[in-house]
Regions:
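Bacterial N-terminal signal peptides that target proteins for export
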Residues: 4-20
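Bacterial N-terminal signal peptides
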Residues: 19-31
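Boundary at the C-terminal end of the N-terminal hydrophobic targeting segment
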Residues: 34-35
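Short, surface-exposed loop or secondary-structure junction motifs
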Residues: 40-41, 140-388
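Short, conserved catalytic-motif segment at the N-terminal edge
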Residues: 42-111, 131-133, 147-156, 298-299, ...
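Short, conserved phosphate/pyrophosphate- and ester-handling motifs at nucleotide-, phospho-/glycolipid
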Residues: 53, 116, 317
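Active-site SXXK
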Residues: 58-65, 78, 84, 109-141, ...
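Short, well-ordered beta-strand elements
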Residues: 402-404, 410-419
């Protein structure tokens, strides 16, 4: 990368979104980039024009290339935007470590739980439409939840544990699904009798079941906690996907595609990848790094299955997800089309966990963060191990993907890789290196 180049030269093969392709193809001629007309909705700028240090941004690419050379990750794509403009794009390493093909910026990644913010936004769009209520019981949309029970562990004098089933103190609501206070859980990590029951019943999002069948099955399982009492990472957003289906009268993907993905130009964001040309662009992890948890192998998006997992099933690209984040950065609109009102988006990215809500030991948002409706939300400048502004929001995926939006810094970042074992340490390093590149303040976007 030359000192005056705002972006690493890359080659794009994306044809499905002409505006986005034209925008990113500008990086083929970095010396003349400033003279290029930006594409609508995703313009490019020089780092120095938005208060970023090119030298410090370039260090991110150097770090990632060193990690690839050390065979710790196969490859990665990173995008840094400020002031609503892409200021840095880098693709390093290989798309698939078993095939000698360089990573491209528009390659496809299993984004796992970065599906959750997309589905959460779709749910709030239905709220704005008047077709969904956050305070409504989940049972209004999925009747099987009308008879749900809470599992209470008891231990006798000999140390034997049993599970008593009791009625919930209140109904599980749609808002509970969005903020992970539903009482549902995940069975592939942690311990306890409810989690063991999930494992024994093979409760997982995927396989040869429809979303409706999955929702009915998980409704028969005991809740790990009283609804509203405890934050526990869970299949809540999968159940939310079924709520969206019932409220909209469409399959989850049909609804996402019509209301969000196609209008945003996110044509590479799908649950499955049946097309051979797109299959060739799927990023893969190392052969010995293909599990995200107990009995949870990395899924194969080439195989079309009945279920569309709202909690972790989407495949996407860095440019697609950048479009989604740019819409959020813009207060809910992009290219003249509004998806959410500014008030609704502010509501989503506000902490929804009162002091009375307990947090499990595996509290994924981390110190200094609460949780909104689909996002972890920074609540204080301190506590966390890296700088961020109060109001910053983020989330990531089990396969290694990560994103954050910092409205006070007018900054957003997309990071894509397929390295499940490396996902946590790389996030903090990336945060610190991006923060180091912010050398001037800009007015907040909103």
């Amino acid at each position: 990368m030359t000192p005056d180049s705002p972006l690493m030269p890359v080659v794009l093969r994306r044809r499905s979104s002409l505006a986005l392709a034209l925008c990113l193809l500008c990086v083929l001629c970095p010396q003349t980039l400033s003279a290029q007309a930006p594409a609508p909705g995703l313009p490019i700028t020089k780092p120095s024009d938005v208060g970023l240090s090119l030298q410090r941004l370039s260090a991110i690419g150097d770090w990632l290339r060193a990690e690839v050379a050390a065979k710790r990750i196969p490859g990665a794509v990173v995008m840094v935007a400020r002031g609503g403009k892409l200021a840095y794009v880098e693709a390093v390493g290989q798309r698939d470590p078993t095939i000698p093909a360089a990573m491209k910026t528009d390659d496809l990644f299993r984004i796992y739980s970065m599906t959750k913010p997309v589905v959460s936004v779709a749910a709030l769009m239905l709220v704005e439409d008047g077709r969904l209520l956050l305070e409504a019981p989940v049972a209004r949309y999925i009747p099987a939840f009308a008879n749900v029970k809470v599992g209470i562990e008891k231990t006798d004098a000999q140390g034997n544990k049993t599970l008593d089933l009791v009625a919930p103190r209140r109904a599980m609501t749609v808002q509970d699904l969005l903020r992970h206070t539903s009482g549902l859980t995940y069975g592939f990590f942690g311990d306890g009798l409810v989690k063991k029951a999930y494992q024994d019943a093979n409760i997982s999002a995927g396989g040869n079941q429809t979303l409706a069948e999955f929702a009915d099955r998980i409704a028969q399982m005991p809740l790990a906690y009283q609804p509203g009492s405890t934050w526990d990472y869970s299949n809540s957003t999968d159940v939310l996907g079924r709520v969206i289906e019932v409220a909209s009268g469409q399959s989850l993907y049909t609804h996402l595609k019509a209301r969000l993905l196609d209008p945003l130009g996110m044509t590479d964001t799908t649950f499955y990848v049946p097309e051979p040309a797109r299959q060739a662009r799927i990023a893969e992890p190392w052969p010995d790094d293909r599990s995200i948890g107990v009995n949870a192998p990395v899924f194969d998006p080439r195989q079309i299955m009945p279920m569309e997992s709202g909690g972790g099933g989407l495949v996407s690209s860095a440019p697609d997800y950048a479009r989604f984040l740019l819409m959020l950065r813009n207060g809910g609109q992009l290219d003249g089309k509004r998806y959410l009102s500014p008030a609704t988006l502010a509501f989503m990215t506000t902490d929804h966990l009162s002091p009375a809500v307990l947090k499990t030991p595996l509290y994924l948002p981390g110190p200094g963060y609460g949780f909104g409706l689909g996002f972890a939300v920074r609540t204080s400048a301190g506590e966390a191990a890296y700088p961020a502004s109060p109001g910053e929001f983020y989330w990531g995926g089990a396969g290694g993907t990560y994103m954050w939006v910092d409205p006070a810094q007018d900054l957003f970042v997309v990071f894509m890789m397929q390295s499940p074992r490396q996902r946590v340490p790389y996030r903090s390093v990336l945060r610190n290196m991006v923060n180091a590149a912010v050398i001037e303040r800009l007015p907040a976007a909103r």
